[in-house]
Amino acid sequence: MFYIVPREPQQRWGLEQRWLLPMALSPKDFDEPLLAPDTAVRHYVVACHREKAQLRGTQTLNYIEHWERQVLNPRGLARPVIGVHNLPRVRKTRRDPWYNLVDDLTRRGTAPVLLPRRIYQRYRVVWNQAGWVAGENFIEVLPQPQVPLEPLLAVLNAGVSEMALRVSAHVYGGGVYNLSPGSVGEVPVVDVRQLSAERQDQLTSAYRGFLQSKGKDRGALDTVVLDVLGLPPTFAASLESALGRMQHLSDAVLEPIAVDPNEGNTWLEELCLL
């Protein structure tokens, strides 16, 4: 795939960092629910708007010309195509130069909150602090103005939110919980703007503890969120039991690399893997 470059090929080619953007391709790409400036990058997006004449002497030009010579067999065509630039979907965009995704990526922007598109055993909402480009395995969330981000992330990572999202998802065979942007918008979430400053501070503190555990311990976070909702401490055990049964449905499921690119898709076609 020309536009998405894993770290190993990037290093092998020696592709210049100034024409690459870090990409969150899959929840399996990182071990904690935070994309910080120092998070290790496993995939990049080629983001170069320079003409080939301006790229002389660079590894990026060698990479581009390599892909212009490749024989490809796109689905739906009877004959092979020589070069990524001659693929019908690439020619249809009329980008100048053909590999320039910079304008589209700039218009699209990035979101600070990444929901998993499909939920398996593990559920984590990612804070996209570093502003990575998100792939099709995520639903990007742009909070409303004036919504404090860390309290919101605390609520979204809590067990009650996991339950609400799993309930609203379509369940596929094998226990795969598939979320769509439309259904996510209808899931009830605590309006953290309406909480007192003290409550917001409690949520922020609990969320930072959750991050320190690399997303492995949300006990304190759940306690604060249940208290905010006015639910008794005994509710936590019932919640964990119900979530355990839901997660058990996914025990035998292997997480795929990609999802259906036609379902609620807002990604650039070149960044879809199917």
Residue spans for each PLM region:
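Non-catalytic DNA-recognition/assembly elements of restriction-modification systems
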Residues: 59, 191-274
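Polybasic, glycine- and aromatic-enriched phosphate-binding surface used to engage nucleic acids
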Residues: 1-205
